[in-house]
């Protein structure tokens, strides 16, 4: 006589006990092979990091300016390199990418150098001589991407002087009076980064001017600097505070007129904020003229 089929209630505990046994066995195996599990986890983490680094091209060696992603320049990425030589056109630097174990050892690197120029600095002849003496062939240095024009990269050059102390060669040249500040090519002139960079460069230049270092020993150079600074200030102030002509809006409503005035007022306040440093420069220039007359 056939047995009656087992009830569903009796099958459920058997299934639960079976699943529990599987979990127990897996846990026991993991405990017995804990080091292996840790090594697998570490290997997966390292593999993930390596894939991430390769995805953002940090391990790629750049031999021309066109190799460098636009995003690198926009984010002002710092790259490491080895100086090859200094020419009239700029510095030729061999890029040194991040190396990965077991990959970089057998990977054949392309050959080539990047043409790097000092961003925001116009070197004098004395400045070129000083730079030749300061930097040696094959010297390691960092260059921070700020702009690009054709095949040239405009960068901050950073040289390590021991420990965590890096010297910004762009500012150091200006502090010694071995160059003049110029606009950084390839950089968005309306960005906050532009004003921050030029503020630091102008501060370095003013240090040399106050001490009479380098080219600022000559009174003619000082006068030329003051004249250009004054003209530049007047041009920028007039441009940023240029209000809409009243005759063009005579037919508009009163509300739209007040709105336009309010917008212009806000724009003027922003201009004052952005050019606060130039106000300090004007004050400094006025004091120098006063001392000269005295």
UniProtKB/Swiss-Prot annotation:
Its main location: membrane. It comes from the Eukaryota. GO terms for biological process: negative regulation of ERK1 and ERK2 cascade; regulation of DNA-binding transcription factor activity. Residues 244-271 are annotated as: Disordered. The modification N-acetylalanine is found at residue 2. InterPro entries: C3orf33-like, SNase_OB-fold_sf. Keywords: Acetylation, Membrane, Transmembrane, Transmembrane helix. The chain crosses the membrane at residues 36-53. It is found in: Membrane. SUPFAM superfamilies: Staphylococcal nuclease. The keyword Transmembrane helix applies. It is a single-pass membrane protein. GO terms for cellular component: extracellular space; membrane. May play a role in transcription regulation. This is Protein C3orf33 homolog. It comes from Mus musculus (Mouse).
